[in-house]
Regions:
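Non-cofactor substrate-recognition interfaces
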Residues: 2-8, 15-260
C-alpha cells in the first residue's frame, strides 16, 4: 500500500555536491528495508528505503509500537512500519527523480567516450549540441539509477551512497562501470568544469557557454544558488583583509544547510 512519497535515504558528507548527483549506490549483499513513516520536520507521510542494520540510527524502537494513524505532528516519537525487505541486488536498476534539477547530465562525444554515450548520440542526434569544435550529448534519461558498489558499508550513514562522478575517484569509477553519465559545466571557453569553481562557488550562468545552458541548464532552478559559495569559509564576506572571521561564519547559515 502506498504511503506518502517514496524516497531513498542517501548518505553524504558533502551536501554541496548533491546538485551534481547522477546515481545512488547500494551494496549488492546488504539487506535493505522499506519503512512507512512521517517526515519529522513537516509531518508528511513518507516511505523510505535504507539499510536494515542502520534503522536504529534513525528510528526509535518505541516508534514501532505506535500505529501510523496515531501520529500527530510534533510528537517526540515518530511511528514507523517496515513493509518490505530487499537485497541491494534487487534494488539495482531502480530509477529516481533528480534531487536538484538544476543541470542535466551530459558527456563529450569523441573517440574516448563510453560506448553508451556514442550509442545515445547516434540514436538521438536531437540531444546533441556543439560548443566550439566539441560535441556533447545530454544524458538525463541515462542517469538517476540505483547502481551496485562493493565498497558500500553500513558502518555509518544509511547504506546508500550519493554518487557525483565529477567529485571523487570512487564515484567516477563506479558510475563509469554502470553506464552512468557525469554532470559538469561548460564555460565560455569551451572547457568542461565541475559545478563548483576553483574558489569554491557555483558557476554563474553568465560564465557558461550559451549552447550548454540552452541544452542542459534549468535557469530558473539554478539561478537560486548560481554564484553562491559552497562553504562560508570560502566567501569573501568572512575573509576581509586576508583574515578569516570563523565566529561570524559559524553563526551564519551555511549553504550545506540551505540546500538541504
Amino acid at each position: 500500500t502506498q504511503w506518502g512519497t517514496p524516497y531513498f535515504i542517501a548518505w553524504t558528507t558533502t551536501p554541496w555536491t548533491l546538485p551534481s548527483n547522477t546515481a545512488l549506490c547500494v551494496g549488492p549483499k546488504i539487506n535493505y528495508v522499506c519503512v512507512q513513516t512521517y517526515n519529522p520536520y513537516n509531518g508528511e507521510k513518507i516511505s523510505v528505503v535504507l539499510a536494515e542494520s542502520r534503522m536504529s540510527a534513525y528510528f526509535k524502537a518505541d516508534g514501532a509500537k505506535i500505529a501510523l494513524e496515531d501520529y500527530n505532528p510534533g510528537d517526540k516519537v515518530v511511528p514507523y512500519k517496515v513493509v518490505g525487505k530487499y537485497t541491494g541486488e534487487e534494488l539495482v536498476g531502480m530509477r529516481y527523480t533528480q534531487l536538484m534539477p538544476w543541470v542535466k547530465p551530459l558527456e563529450k562525444v569523441d573517440d574516448l567516450a563510453a560506448d553508451f554515450v556514442k550509442k545515445v548520440a547516434e540514436e538521438h542526434p536531437e540531444r546533441c549540441f556543439t560548443v566550439g569544435t566539441d560535441r556533447f550529448v545530454e544524458l538525463e534519461a541515462e542517469g538517476f539509477r540505483v547502481i551496485p558498489g562493493d565498497y558500500v558499508t553500513t558502518d555509518d550513514g544509511t547504506g546508500i551512497v550519493h554518487i557525483a562522478p565529477t567529485f571523487g575517484a570512487d564515484d567516477a569509477k563506479v558510475a563509469k562501470a554502470a553506464g552512468i553519465p557525469s554532470l559538469f559545466m561548460i564555460n565560455k571557453k569551451g572547457e568542461t568544469r565541475p559545478m563548483v569553481d576553483l574558489v569554491g562557488k557555483y558557476y554563474t550562468i553568465d560564465e557558461c557557454a550559451p549552447e550548454f545552458v540552452a541544452a542542459c541548464v534549468n535557469e530558473e532552478n539554478y539561478a537560486h544558488h548560481a554564484g553562491d559559495f559552497v562553504k562560508n569559509a570560502y566567501s569573501p564576506k568572512y575573509n576581509v583583509g586576508g583574515k578569516y572571521d570563523a565566529e561570524a561564519a559559524e553563526k551564519d547559515e551555511d549553504l550545506n544547510i540551505v540546500i538541504c
